């Protein structure tokens, strides 16, 4: 049943992305290993009866206390477990009572706003400039990084782009297919258009603009294959490490999503309305986008504190809560009144 869930049900019936399948598989594998160790039994002897509500709560507590996993990670794991057990209970009536218990488990409550990792425009430029446009690989990687930043797209959205999804005419834009096959169109900046025209001429010579070929690909043993998210992560790490020598603010390990976070933050800091930022990112709920407003406000608060000596009378009068999202000026900006 586990095999059918991951090999047939998720990819062929639910059309779940490879990234989500990997996440779900990792969760179920971790959970089964946890049950095995807690009950001191071989993996082959782990049964559905072991997956009680208490067991799941214990596993989530283990993630929180021993693995120091974030609330988001805990909830992702909980959602994966619920999805799997829902599938199982639809096919095995004897475990419905287990699913009923699991459904009652509450998700962990995150802080009102969690921190956002993002890079400055200088750091983004430093990473992009590590690519060598004189080589095929270097030029491809440069276009990839520029497009990732310009669109603020998720990794899977970038990987799914086909030639037919790109329009480089008077109103240049790209169509992205996000979570749940949700579609959105994102405008492209002229510098990005210039690079894309060169890239398509170089890597897709002879192909029509309406072709179904994936924009980014690699050639392995003479076979053309779509670029993988693992490859993109490697590319990010490679150029991130090189750029760190000239730009120390770049963290030791960077992930593709940091370009998305950075683009969103830069757009917000440049004055783009939060509703537009939300649409740009493809968020289904603007509350998800509020994290960027909070992060920017928190950054300003820290800058003010750093600029004010602790012994200063002014410093003593500063109240940090004044600069939270409840601030009237910020609220007016968030609601479009300013």
Where are the regions a protein language model picked out?
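Conserved catalytic core of the tyrosine transesterase superfamily
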Residues: 1-338
């Amino acid at each position: 049943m586990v095999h059918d869930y991951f090999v047939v049900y998720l990819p062929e019936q639910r059309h779940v992305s490879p990234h989500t399948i990997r996440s779900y598989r990792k969760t179920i594998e971790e959970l089964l290993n946890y049950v095995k160790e807690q009950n001191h039994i071989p993996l082959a002897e782990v049964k559905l009866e072991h997956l009680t509500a208490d067991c799941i709560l214990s596993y989530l507590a283990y993630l929180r206390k021993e693995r120091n996993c974030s609330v988001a990670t805990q909830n992702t794991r909980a959602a994966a477990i619920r999805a799997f057990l829902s599938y199982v209970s639809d096919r095995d009536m004897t475990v419905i009572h287990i699913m009923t218990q699991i459904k009652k488990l509450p998700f962990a409550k995150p802080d009102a706003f969690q921190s956002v990792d993002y890079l400055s425009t200088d750091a983004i430029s430093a990473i992009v400039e590590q690519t060598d446009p004189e080589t095929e690989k270097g030029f491809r990687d440069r276009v990839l990084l520029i497009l990732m930043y310009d669109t603020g797209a998720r990794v899977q959205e970038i990987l799914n782009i086909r030639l037919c999804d790109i329009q480089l005419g008077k109103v240049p834009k790209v169509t992205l297919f996000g979570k749940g096959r949700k579609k959105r169109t994102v405008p492209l900046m002229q510098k990005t258009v210039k690079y894309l025209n060169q890239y398509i001429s170089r890597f897709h010579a002879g192909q029509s603009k309406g072709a179904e070929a994936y924009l980014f690909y690699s050639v392995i043993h003479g076979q053309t294959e779509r670029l993988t998210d693992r490859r993109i992560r490697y590319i990010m790490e490679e150029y991130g490490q090189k750029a760190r020598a000239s730009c120390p603010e770049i963290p030791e390990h960077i992930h593709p999503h940091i370009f998305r976070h950075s683009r969103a933050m830069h757009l917000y800091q440049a004055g783009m309305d939060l509703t537009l930022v939300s649409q740009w990112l493809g968020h289904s709920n603007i509350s998800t986008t509020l994290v960027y407003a909070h992060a920017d406000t928190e950054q300003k608060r820290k800058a003010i504190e750093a600029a004010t000596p602790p012994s200063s009378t002014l410093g003593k009068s500063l109240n940090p809560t004044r600069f939270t999202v409840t601030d009237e000026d910020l609220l007016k900006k968030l609601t479009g009144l300013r």
